[in-house]
Swiss-Prot record:
PTM-bearing positions, type N6-glutaryllysine: 92
Compartment list: Nucleus; Chromosome
Subunit structure comment from the entry: The nucleosome is a histone octamer containing two molecules each of H2A, H2B, H3 and H4 assembled in one H3-H4 heterotetramer and two H2A-H2B heterodimers. The octamer wraps approximately 147 bp of DNA.
Post-translational modification: Glutarylation at Lys-92 (H4K91glu) destabilizes nucleosomes by promoting dissociation of the H2A-H2B dimers from nucleosomes.
PANTHER family according to UniProt: HISTONE H4 (PTHR10484)
Superkingdom of the source species: Eukaryota
Protein name (Swiss-Prot/TrEMBL): Histone H4
Recorded GO CC terms: nucleosome; nucleus
Taxonomic source organism: Phanerodontia chrysosporium (White-rot fungus)
Length: 103
C-alpha cells in the first residue's frame, strides 16, 4: 500500500478533517414532489398532507439502519470505503434482498 496517502493501513494517527460540513436537517432535501413521485410509482392516487413528514421520518430510520449495517461490514473488512456489496449484504440481513449489484 505504498504511495497511498496517510501511511497505508492502520499507520499514523490520521489527521483532522478540514472543511467538514456540519450535516443537519438534510432530511428536508427529500422534497414533497420526490415523495409524491415515489408514491405514484407505488400506485397511490391521492396523498394526505401529513404523509410527507411521516415518510421522511420512516425513510430516515430505514437509511440509518442500512447504513449502520453497511459500515459494520466495511469496518469488519478493515476498509474505509463502503462498497455496493456492503449495502447489498446489509439489505439482505434486514430481509430485503437486492439483485443486480453483485453477489
Amino acid at each position: 500500500m505504498s504511495g497511498r496517502g496517510k501511511g497505508g493501513k492502520g499507520l499514523g494517527k490520521g489527521g483532522a478533517k478540514r472543511h467538514r460540513k456540519i450535516l443537519r436537517d438534510n432530511i428536508q432535501g427529500i422534497t414533497k414532489p420526490a415523495i409524491r413521485r415515489l408514491a405514484r410509482r407505488g400506485g397511490v392516487k391521492r396523498i394526505s398532507g401529513l404523509i410527507y413528514e411521516e415518510t421522511r421520518g420512516v425513510l430516515k430510520i430505514f437509511l440509518e439502519n442500512v447504513i449502520r449495517d453497511s459500515v459494520t461490514y466495511t469496518e469488519h473488512a478493515k476498509r474505509k470505503t463502503v462498497t455496493a456489496l456492503d449495502v447489498v449484504y446489509a439489505l439482505k440481513r434486514s430481509g430485503r434482498t437486492l439483485y443486480g449489484f453483485g453477489a
